[in-house]
Amino acid sequence: MKKIYNVYFLCGFATLGGGLFGFDISSMSGVLGTAAYTNYFQVGSGQYKQGSITCAMPFGSLVGALCSSFIADRYSRVRAIQFSSILWIIGSIFMCASNGIPLLVVGRVIAGGCVGIASAMVPVYQAEIAPKEIRGRVISLQQWAITWGILIQYFIQYGASNIDGGPNNPTQSTAAFRIPWGIQIVPGVILFFGMFLFPKSPRWLASKDRWEEALQVLSKLHGQGDVNHPKVLAEYKEIQEALALEREQSATGFQELIKPRIFKRVILGMSLQMWSQLCGMNVMMYYIVYIMQSTGAGSPLLTASIQYILNTALTLPAIIYLDKFGRRPAILIGFFLQAIFLYLEGGLQGGFGAPNPHTDPKLDAISWTVADHPAVGKAIIALSYLFVCSFATTIGPTSWTYPAEIYPAKVRAKAVSLATASNWIWNCLLALFVPPLLWSINWKMYMIFAAFNTAAFIHMFLTAPETKGYTLEEMDDVFDSGLPAWRKLERKSRMEELEKEIIEGNLKITPAHEATGVSATHVTPEKQV
């Protein structure tokens, strides 16, 4: 089957996997406020049942993320993403057909397996096929796709919530939640068939000693099909050298991850994904309807929808400018602003709020309200929007870009799967415990998440160096330089040096890679490989 080699198309289409992640995030938020969902599943007060339903998908995603590297390393990144789409289709069918909480939970766990695999392997595939000049841009497309998935699913649910007289009609049909859960099958089907058009990652091919194929793919991705293009040969040579070094070190698999030079990067990637959850964004996504209800918003579903639009729109600037301004500034600015907005939001909730008198049955899911202070309610809504905007332009894109690019090729899939698993562990815990926390400690929860953002800012300032402008094979130099994280490694690009030598005729790369030898043979007056 004929393959497509346009990097932007490949990276953009692959983010349908991120879109499924977005469908997951808002797969509950739009139905929580409907009578059909509440009456059919009998979630009740206290929210432990709802927390269990919500966290089923993050739990499945955790399992999927942990398994993703085994599938991706053995069968390729492309086949791993394709397999994930099958899980999504099966899980969505179960959700759509659910006749009670048990089948709904099973469906969400299976669909979650898809999201775990896709969320780990889509950024890896993007990082391995994109040139360094646009790597941040194309990987951040993953976050944009997530926001589109959130937005599209939410508005599908918002439209379906008006079936049979609207969300407050006690006799509302179950179509209010079955239609949205059924429609989400469609992108899974598109992703499955679309992946047949994708070439395998050249770095994965090289790791399997399929060097001729790797060179052909590189040439079509970055050299318009010319296997002798200097940029293609330089990248090919750099991959050779990196794999040779890794093989000399002999260790493979997870034991390689505990070596000090790699382990610190594993912890960094896992930490960034952890902080991206503990910053509070997914609370805004999963349970925004409850937050809007506590402010006395006239139409919580409609008011909540604005933040989904902002989330999608404000991710676009990050895609455009991430490769210009860098990852580190985005991370630090993001956590700083998010902390400020949450401290203010928690202060307003605590200073002007009061226990919910439960005079309105539609508001039984919340225990704290500022409805008696309309101006304060509007300020809280505005702060929620500002929080979402700051996340969308900073932490959202970088939390996927940064972990996908900081590891050596030999352990990249495994390390990214652990980083993504960290995301899903905390996602699962938050989905389970936030509803009872909102119920029991209400406004204090905002202060807890604000403190997490403060801690994240300090941690990332001390440990996260800039990665903009380096090839994947140069990340070892960045992290092994001995420089503090706030100082950027100043050095010439190894790939640019190789490209220059090739152009000048001082370095010759033999396109046909013979056997498994990857070392350079020096001759005078030229170098030959």
Curated annotation (Swiss-Prot):
The chain crosses the membrane at residues 7-27, 52-72, 86-106, 109-129, 138-158, 179-199, 272-292, 301-321, 330-350, 375-395, 415-439, 446-464. It is found in: Membrane. PROSITE patterns: MFS, SUGAR_TRANSPORT_1. Induction: Expression is induced by the developmental and secondary metabolism regulator veA. Its main location: membrane. The keyword Secreted does not apply. Keywords: Membrane, Sugar transport, Transmembrane, Transmembrane helix, Transport. PANTHER family: MAJOR FACILITATOR SUPERFAMILY (MFS) PROFILE DOMAIN-CONTAINING PROTEIN, PLASTIDIC GLUCOSE TRANSPORTER 4. This is MFS glucose transporter mfs1. It comes from Aspergillus flavus (strain ATCC 200026 / FGSC A1120 / IAM 13836 / NRRL 3357 / JCM 12722 / SRRC 167). The lineage of its organism: Eukaryota, Fungi, Dikarya, Ascomycota, Pezizomycotina. The gene is mfs1.
